[in-house]
From Swiss-Prot:
Physiological role: Plays an important role in innate and adaptive immunity by regulating nucleotide-sensing Toll-like receptor (TLR) signaling. Required for the transport of a subset of TLRs (including TLR3, TLR7 and TLR9) from the endoplasmic reticulum to endolysosomes where they can engage pathogen nucleotides and activate signaling cascades. May play a role in autoreactive B-cells removal.
InterPro entries: UNC93B1
Family: Belongs to the unc-93 family.
Post-translational modification: N-glycosylated.
Name assigned to this protein: Protein unc-93 homolog B1
Length: 597
């Protein structure tokens, strides 16, 4: 009886099965290795590389959109809740019925003090926190603190509102510094992924030309601020769809108001102490706060799940390894740079103008004359104007660099002159369209200011080792300006406008002076960034050269670098240096190397 052949031929077996399989490929020791482990026959390396970098670029766009949407939702929830909370707590009937003698006005004043005063200390800890947690995780942590502030409004007490307000004040500057750093890094990454062929030709250590990422930075900052300025409109949704139904009309709330605009003093002098016709039910308030809490949680998920890392893990290690003492000192050392000193007046004005939009135009000119029920629509006009005008920052792709920033300053200068001589009549609605136009135009100037400043800093300081320090300084000066506005809230409107006008003129002149120095080729004095001092031995540091070292490190190093070895192959295994262990290949070639103690 003849034996049946095996179902699967044995590899290398001789016999009647033959030396070839059904596909004609030789079996056994004669089988070609390329047929088994060779490249895919239809593999196109150039096409696969193009697809890979295309996915990388789409990932960068996803990061920018997620960070922008997260910032918009976070500030929309925060501003909307704070506005609704202050209006409810202002009404004395609401305070007496809901909270009795708990001292709600005192709690509100302490809460505002915590939000406005705490950021003054942010220069001391912001760079340390960003380097410790990393840019993305600092954003996530700060957004989480904003969500914590929202959650404390479920139980409004001194021991919930005031500590959460202090924590929120501590998170303001780190959030904005990390976001500015994040958007700038995304622009640099997008440029890297778009010009990968040029980088392959130049080598990984060759730095791209200075300012080459500027077009992408202009686009990304325009996208970010276009989203962010929509947060002012999102913040008015609780007011429009909920709180406006409970408000008195302007004839009641403005009954004792005698002067508005440039003739007003403080904030809403003579405004009625009762603004609510009926008190909102506690269940309705809980529903509104729950919706806001859900949106804040969504913002956290956006940052956590959709925002990728700003740096590679090895770069994060290098950024931390310069020493915590150096990280603490470097923001102060950057004051030596004349570019930053010339931009400080613009940083201060940037804080002044956004607070003036919310308190001066919206309250001193708007609510004072057309009533509290139109506050939301004034801020929506400001928001839409600013969001649309953020896209005007793209004009920097074709116009000289100073044009958008100076144009925004010019719009604000014109409006400030007009507001200085305008005093709207209380309880008269005929001039309400002027208020909406003024709010929208102020938003245009704000957008050009914010977009222009952030783009300018990203262009002037493109070294990854400096960006968190620079954006920390920028937003710290903004926080100082906001604190100054908080202290001077009781001043006469003419005094506020005069301070605004002087600061704006000084900022524009100082900025143009800086641009003139740059055109003359005056070299800025930048502090040296110390080289990373790694305390661990890991696979990342087996090689002597630092693959993540930037040109700034190489050019401005501390002079302790070793001479480069002569080019050309060296016979035998490379001897292990004093600072590293021999790799396994070297150990196999030349022994186990020096023994460790």
């Amino acid at each position: 009886m003849e034996a049946e052949p095996p179902l699967y031929p044995m590899a290398g077996a001789a016999g009647p099965q033959g030396d070839e399989d059904l596909l004609g490929v030789p079996d056994g020791p004669e089988a070609p290795l390329d047929e088994l482990v060779g490249a895919y026959p239809n593999y196109n390396e150039e096409e696969e590389e193009r697809r890979y970098y295309r996915r990388k670029r789409l990932g960068v766009l996803k990061n920018v959109l997620a960070a922008s949407a997260g910032g918009m939702l976070t500030y929309g929830v925060y501003l909307g809740l704070l506005q609704m909370q202050l209006i409810l707590h202002y009404d004395e009937t609401y305070r007496e019925v809901k909270y009795g003698n708990m001292g709600l006005p005192d709690i509100d004043s302490k809460m505002l003090m915590g939000i406005n005063v705490t950021p003054i200390a942010a220069l001391l800890y912001t760079p340390v926190l960003i380097r410790f947690f990393g840019t993305k995780w600092m954003m996530f942590l700060a957004v989480g603190i904003y969500a914590l502030f929202v959650s404390t409004n479920y139980w409004e007490r001194y021991y919930t509102l005031v500590p959460s307000a202090v924590a929120l004040g501590m998170a303001i500057v780190p959030l904005w510094a990390s976001m500015g750093n994040y958007i700038t890094r995304m622009a640099q990454k997008y440029h890297e992924y778009s010009h990968y062929k040029e980088q392959d030709g130049q080598g990984m250590k060759q730095r791209p030309p200075r300012g080459s990422h500027a077009p992408y930075l202009l686009v990304f900052q325009a996208i970010f601020y276009s989203f962010f300025h929509l947060s002012f409109a999102c913040a008015q949704l609780p007011m429009i769809y909920f709180l406006n139904h409970y408000l008195y009309d302007l004839n009641h709330t403005l009954y004792n108001v005698q002067s508005c605009g440039t003739n007003s003093h403080g904030i809403l002098s003579g405004f009625n102490k009762t603004v609510l016709r009926t008190l909102p039910r506690s269940g309705n308030l809980i529903v509104v706060e729950s919706v806001l809490m859900a949106v804040a949680f969504l913002a956290m998920l956006l940052v956590l799940g959709l925002c990728g890392a700003a740096y590679r893990p090895t770069e994060e290690i290098d950024l931390r390894s310069v020493g915590w003492g150096n990280i603490f000192q470097l923001p102060f050392k950057h004051v030596r740079d004349y570019r930053l000193r010339h931009l400080v007046p613009f940083f201060i004005y940037s804080g002044f103008e956004v607070l003036f939009a919310c308190t001066g135009i919206a309250l001193g000119y708007g609510v004072c004359s057309v009533g509290l029920e139109r506050l939301a629509y004034l801020l929506v006009a400001y928001s839409l104007g600013a969001s649309a005008a953020s896209l005007l920052g793209l004009l920097g792709l074709w116009l000289p660099r100073p044009v958008p920033l100076v144009a925004g300053a010019g719009v604000h200068l014109l409006l400030t002159f007009i507001l200085f001589f305008w005093a709207p009549v209380p309880r008269v609605l005929q001039h309400s369209w002027i208020l909406y136009v003024a709010a929208a135009l102020w938003g245009v100037g704000s957008a050009l200011n914010k977009t222009g400043l952030s783009t300018l800093l990203g262009i002037l300081y493109e070294d990854k080792e400096r960006q968190d320090f620079i954006f920390t300084i920028y937003h710290w000066w903004q926080a100082v300006a906001i604190f100054t506005v908080y202290l001077g809230s009781s001043l006469h409107m003419k005094a506020k406008l005069a301070v605004l006008l002087v600061t704006l003129v000084a900022a524009a002149v100082s900025y143009l002076r800086m641009e003139q120095k740059l055109r003359r080729g005056v070299a800025p004095r930048q502090p040296r960034i110390p080289r990373p001092q790694h305390k661990v031995r890991g696979y990342r540091y087996l090689e002597e050269d630092n693959s993540d070292e930037s040109d700034a490190e190489g050019e401005h190093g501390d002079g302790a670098e070793e001479e480069a070895p002569p080019a050309g192959p060296r016979p035998g295994p490379e001897p292990a240096g004093l600072g590293r262990r021999p790799c396994p290949y070297e150990q196999a070639q030349g022994g186990d190397g020096p023994e460790e103690q």
